[in-house]
Amino acid sequence: MTITKADLAEHLSNEIGFNNREAKEVVEAFFKELSDCLERGEEIKLAGFGVFSMRNKPERPGRNPKTGEEIPITARRVVTFHASGCLKSAVESSPNLSLKAVKAA
């Protein structure tokens, strides 16, 4: 299932009573703040959900799968997410989660 910014705004509108414009502004402001924090290299902790952080990955050797030629993979920064214990427990105990669904993913 994919959840879009529009879906989140609609949920805010329905559950909290924001009008559509306010809900969209809140969602946009939230994601802008997340992006800005990550660009500055700051860690983002969302209690009960998890932690977003930046990690530096060094250059490493790679391989072209078609030719087998070795090529360097450049150093880069990547966003990582670590789920909180609460989120992990909720997912693991979810009755909607089946082993078939996990294997299919």
Curated annotation (Swiss-Prot):
CDD domains: IHF_A. SUPFAM superfamilies: IHF-like DNA-binding proteins (SSF47729). SMART domains: BHL. PROSITE patterns: HISTONE_LIKE. Disulfide bonds: none annotated. InterPro entries: Hist_DNA-bd, Histone-like_DNA-bd_CS, IHF-like_DNA-bd_dom_sf, IHF_alpha. GO terms for biological process: DNA recombination; positive regulation of metabolic process; regulation of DNA-templated transcription; regulation of translation. GO terms for molecular function: DNA binding; structural constituent of chromatin. Keywords: DNA recombination, DNA-binding, Transcription, Transcription regulation, Translation regulation. GO terms for cellular component: cytosol. It holds the Pfam family Bac_DNA_binding. Belongs to the bacterial histone-like protein family. NCBIfam families: himA, PRK00285.1. This protein is one of the two subunits of integration host factor, a specific DNA-binding protein that functions in genetic recombination as well as in transcriptional and translational control. Heterodimer of an alpha and a beta chain. This is Integration host factor subunit alpha 1. The gene is ihfA1.
